[in-house]
C-alpha cells in the first residue's frame, strides 16, 4: 500500500508540474503570434446579388459574404494570409 500511495503521489506531482508549466507559458511566439495571424474584418459597404447572379457593391480588397440564399450581404476583407506559404512554395 505504501508503494502504491507513493507512486500515486509522484504521478499527481508530475501532472501538476506539467499543468503549471504549460499554464505559465502564455507568451505569443512563433506562428501562433497575433502579429502573424490572419485578420478578417467587415468593410464599410454592403453588397447585393444582381439578376445575373453577380454580386455587386464591394470594392478594393473586399468581397461579398452572405448567408444561405440571401440576395443581400456584407463586404469583408481578409488580410495576413500572404505571410503563409502556399502549397506550391512547399513543393
Swiss-Prot record:
Signal peptide: 1-23
Keywords linked to the UniProt accession: Disulfide bond, Glycoprotein, Secreted, Signal
Record GO terms (molecular function): C-X-C chemokine binding
GO cellular component, one term: extracellular region
The name this protein goes by in its record: Evasin P1077
Main location: secreted
Keyword Disulfide bond annotated: yes
Compartmental location: Secreted
Glycosylated residue positions: 46, 69
Function noted in UniProt: Salivary chemokine-binding protein which binds to host chemokines CXCL1, CXCL2, CXCL3, CXCL5, CXCL6 and CXCL11.
Bridged cysteine pairs (disulfide): 43-62, 47-64, 58-75
Keyword RNA-binding: no
